[in-house]
Amino acid sequence: MEKLEKLYEGKAKQLYATDDPEVLWVEYKNTATAGDGEKKEDFTGKGRLNNLITTIIFDLLKKRGIDSHLIKRVDDTGQLVRKVNMFPLEIVLRNVAAGHFCSRLGVEEGLPLKEPVLEYFLKNDDLHDPFVNDDDLVALGVCTREDLAEIAPLARKINEALIEIFAKIDVKLVDFKIEMGRATDGTLLLADEITPDSCRLWDQKDHSGKVEHLDKDLFRRGLGSIIPAYEEIEERLAELAKSEGIEVAE
């Protein structure tokens, strides 16, 4: 498969055409950003780790009946993915109060939520990805009621699967954001990535109750390098994947 012209560049990834019109090449970058891109730094090895982590998680989800756009990992920082028509939407699932949820509702970080909270944010850099509800999305033509009737249960299914996956490696899944799109045949697919960039992950190995971040909050809050945490997540996920018979790149 040949990588052709660049189609798009975001904060964490680049997207390229290939010689197959139904296949795209995703290239993971070493850049970490926070605060709508105001804070920015390169971390050597981050792109490789996020490529590995997303590949492993998508493979684990596939074993649990959840399909994604991933075809395969092709090198350290590259993936081949199915071309999908993306919804311009960040889909957020929250299991524990943290981040924007706390500042918006005045609750303490770490509060366990009585049930998972599903939220939508419109992807719009100029508006800082505003929080929107179902009616907003339908009124703006972002998606239909029928789309939402598929998106919401799939998002909740992904949440349940990820809670189980991360619990097996002694990590609490606090919250995460995902994206979805439709393949050319109309199938709704999980797309984009699932990495410590897009999740809040708290280490539970010592069972002390103390919060130890294994995610991009280390960068957001100036708590140190993200690389050791990302390496730890990749190593634990790789061991889990191998135990489930999934081939993992060394």
From Swiss-Prot:
Gene3D superfamilies: ATP-grasp fold, B domain, Phosphorylase Kinase, domain 1. The keyword Cell inner membrane does not apply. Keywords: ATP-binding, Ligase, Nucleotide-binding, Purine biosynthesis. InterPro entries: SAICAR_synt/ADE2_N, SAICAR_synt_PurC, SAICAR_synth, SAICAR_synthetase. Its EC number is 6.3.2.6. GO terms for biological process: 'de novo' IMP biosynthetic process; cobalamin biosynthetic process. It catalyses: 5-amino-1-(5-phospho-D-ribosyl)imidazole-4-carboxylate + L-aspartate + ATP = (2S)-2-[5-amino-1-(5-phospho-beta-D-ribosyl)imidazole-4-carboxamido]succinate + ADP + phosphate + 2 H(+). It comes from the Bacteria. Pathway: Purine metabolism; IMP biosynthesis via de novo pathway; 5-amino-1-(5-phospho-D-ribosyl)imidazole-4-carboxamide from 5-amino-1-(5-phospho-D-ribosyl)imidazole-4-carboxylate: step 1/2. The keyword Ligase applies. HAMAP family: SAICAR_synth. Belongs to the SAICAR synthetase family. This is Phosphoribosylaminoimidazole-succinocarboxamide synthase. The gene is purC.
